């Protein structure tokens, strides 16, 4: 009989110290993080190391094995247009999950599980908000990944949070910010109710990221196709 592990620190910071943070080449617009293979639509992404997820289990038997990476998208002039911390596990035995995908004022929230009590398939998005405030107050994992770097983020951004997990302890987690001229997916409709000020195409983009992340968590291949990240100004990232 397999051991049954209980997820107790989904938001705990990883403990891996980063002493050197250099961009890694993104071969063929694909990166591997944990068991997840992330396909990127754009050619100008960079990957940096990030602290592992550090998800502990209640039984005291250590952590669920995981890996994380910081994905940075630059504009043609070199400015940062998006920064996404993506973490994934390799899975470990059985996982008991409690659903905490609840509505939050001012945010778009969609529960891909349909409200199941023992599932965690949640996407949140909002904004645009001041980026420094977002990262320092609401994105601890992204903040930890950015600390070794000297990156100038967009002043105002759309935030996206994602947590997908199954009972085999296969997990994908995202904390990311995308510049305020982000166009999202204009031809798609959000799956949930929009908060004030959030553009529907941004919520639709978050939904699409959620759907492909859920597929990655539950598939043998672990393939995750990042939706197109495009911008509306003359500074658009190709």
Description of each model-found segment:
Residues 130-234:
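Short, well-structured beta-strand
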Residues 37-69, 123-158:
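Generic detector of solvent-exposed, compositionally biased contiguous segments
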Residues 27-33, 71-73, 120, 124, ...:
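Short acidic-hydrophobic surface loop/beta-edge motif
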Residues 236-238:
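Short, solvent-exposed mixed-charge patches
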Residues 23-112:
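N-terminal Sec/ER secretory leader and immediately downstream segment
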Residues 1-9:
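Bacterial N-terminal signal peptides that target proteins for export
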Residues 8-17:
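Bacterial N-terminal signal peptides
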Residues 87-147:
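Low-complexity, serine/threonine/proline-enriched polar segments
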């Amino acid at each position: 009989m397999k051991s049954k592990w209980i997820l107790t620190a989904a938001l705990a910071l990883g403990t891996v110290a980063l002493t050197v943070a250099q961009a890694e080449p993104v071969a063929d617009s694909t990166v591997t993080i944990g068991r997840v293979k992330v396909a990127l639509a754009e050619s100008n992404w960079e990957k940096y190391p990030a602290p592992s997820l550090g998800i502990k289990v209640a039984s005291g038997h250590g952590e669920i094995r995981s890996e994380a990476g910081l994905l940075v998208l630059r504009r043609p002039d070199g400015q940062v247009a998006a920064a996404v911390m993506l973490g994934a596990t390799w899975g470990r035995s059985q996982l008991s999950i409690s659903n905490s995908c609840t509505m939050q004022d001012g945010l778009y929230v969609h529960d891909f599980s349909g409200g199941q009590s023992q599932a965690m398939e949640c996407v949140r998005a909002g904004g645009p908000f001041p980026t420094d405030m977002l990262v320092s107050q609401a994105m601890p994992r992204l903040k930890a990944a950015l600390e070794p770097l000297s990156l100038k983020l967009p002043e105002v951004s759309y935030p996206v949070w994602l947590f997908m997990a199954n009972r085999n302890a296969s997990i994908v987690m995202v904390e990311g910010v995308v510049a305020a001229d982000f166009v999202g997916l204009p031809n798609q409709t959000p799956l949930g109710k929009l908060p004030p000020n959030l553009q529907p195409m941004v919520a639709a983009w978050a939904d699409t990221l959620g759907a492909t992340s859920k597929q990655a968590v539950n598939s043998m291949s672990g393939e995750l196709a990042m939706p197109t990240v495009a911008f509306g100004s003359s500074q658009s990232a190709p």
